[in-house]
Amino acid sequence: LGKKVHAYSFCLDTHPSYDFQKAKEIAEIFNWPFTGIEVPTKNLADDWHRLVQLDCRKKTHFECVYPFLYVYPEIKQKYVLSGWAADGYYGVSKKAQIHYKHTQELFDKFRDNYFSPEMCAGYNWHKKVSDEYDKVFVTPYLTESVKEFFYSKSWDEVNKPFQKHHVRNAFDEFKRTGKIKNHLNLQIDSGIVELFESLLPNKEINFKNRSRIMDVCRDWHGLNTTKANSNTLEEFLI
């Protein structure tokens, strides 16, 4: 296509990740400039409130958007090309493989839910960050033509003989990248899930003394909704 590529990836300052190392390796293979961003973890409590201000609601929103608070300030280009939400077409999560892969109807039900506006790996909340930095967030996997292609396939057709074989076989460039691991959850592989668990002892953030971060996320969404109705934190806690 004649486009100049500059590759970006991130890792936590406490947790080197496979995705980060592989992105750097592939950039070297194709002779692309590469910028690796180490996300500082010491600011997590403050960053939590930044995510609340972005109206993050679910645990997935908080965890998936968090690192990009630090990535976008480092991006110099106008257009940001991403494979955002690609994994939704493949149904590679544990939940999908247990409950949704066995019939086309179930598989499409899973994908319909995944790509619903309030889900989609937190796309709407990610885009708020890209808009804040005046970037054009380009997401080919969210186009209608790509959706139609994948929805025409069953779970077996998109995952056998190996994950993402349609895409990897369509471009000769993938032959140069070597072996790539199967799907890795962004939040788990990067260490973000474990990092967010460290907020549970924080009484200001975990103000209802929850044992799960997903419940803390819901509490803050509820608090945001309550504030919109001009109530106070004390009223919300009652």
Placement of each model-derived feature along the sequence:
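ATP-dependent adenylate-handling active sites, centered on carboxylate activation for C-N bond formation
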Residues: 1-174, 187, 191-199, 233-237
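Peripheral terminal appendages
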Residues: 174-238
